[in-house]
């Protein structure tokens, strides 16, 4: 049973075929908060306070061209308040106070304000996930996300790693990702676990 620190990410890993004791251990790790577990099919935890059914696709970059962009800046801890405001507005997925510690995050600004961002989240040997791809509503349709994705692909590929991402099945950005050269690798289901109140 593994999970990220609660202020970094809500994600948790459980064994492929969890036992009741595994679920009890999961609850003890969750504490008073919540966690999200991803699996190829819905899980049926033997614990209370479970929310099922977040369908996701996992996509891999099969033929995505990376490129550096002189206007894209690397974000730092000093940018976290702006990052949290942008992610609260756009809801690209969980972004918490310390999520920036998971990898490199990049942004684009307009009149000094952060208006688009994306970064690195989960890692597996030879692979890095692109996450938190978001653009403020008034700046959508300008290709900002594409520029950020290409920047991340460049940096990740430059390290000799492959790129993947996750998206909610209903996310219209999936079409954009496919147009850039991403392919659906598999479907997943997210299960949210909360400690009983």
Each language-model region and where it sits:
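Conserved catalytic-core motifs of GNAT/GCN5-like acyltransferases
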Residues: 51-61, 183-197
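A conserved beta-strand-loop-helix scaffold within acyl/acetyltransferase catalytic domains
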Residues: 94-104, 108-137
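Recognition helices and adjacent regulatory flanks at domain boundaries
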Residues: 108-109, 121, 142-155, 162, ...
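Conserved beta-strand-loop-alpha-helix junction that forms the acyl-donor binding cleft
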Residues: 38-42, 155, 164-175, 190-197
